[in-house]
Amino acid sequence: LLIRAAEKIGVRIPRFCDHPLLAPSANCRQCLVDVAMPGRDGVVRPMPKPQPSCAMTAMDGMEINTQATSEVAAKAQAGTMEFLLINHPLDCPVCDKGGECPLQNHALELMASGAQSATRFTDVKRTFPKPLRLTSNILLDRDRCILCQRCVRFADQIPGDPFIALQGRGGGHPSYDMDGHPEHAGGLYSEQIGRFDARVLDFSTGSAEQTVDADLQTIPGVPALSALGAPTGPG
């Protein structure tokens, strides 16, 4: 894949839905790059639109320009980010992922690069009732979901138990169904955006253990709710 080839030569392409252990999905569109490919006549021609580097295979003769070298790619990524943030809540200080969130980090990088720093969205942000309790230990904040589907793909492809599903289409649809299988739900809390809260860390519980991920120390361990007993690094 283009995104893996870029990693090997030290070129960073932002992404949210991509994960090396999961099959490509190109959901978030944040890794768009400017691509030119050789045709049958050997002439290299640019593709009409930016392409997701997480779902495109690297081939001989390709010419790839990332956000660092292409204004087209940079504009496409900035536009994607603007759409992601239109309805995203500004609650980073109380979010479990505050301080180590890829969405937050990339937004700050774009602002530092001179991209659009103030929203042009003047309507009311979309909201959902919260929290939605998926299991006794996992709470879902649907306002924070960016529809990357990493949780859905993890369940389907890693333990092979599709215990969670995303229903509907479009920005107003995030509806999750746990399908009554919480055995592997412990893996959800490791997701990159703070839409899943561990109940002990949730600020509404009144627990003395209230904190955020960035304040935790990582130690080797085994997730209590993992039926696989796979090693992990809980905080």
Identify the role of each PLM range.
Residues 29-234:
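Fe-S ferredoxin-like electron-transfer domains
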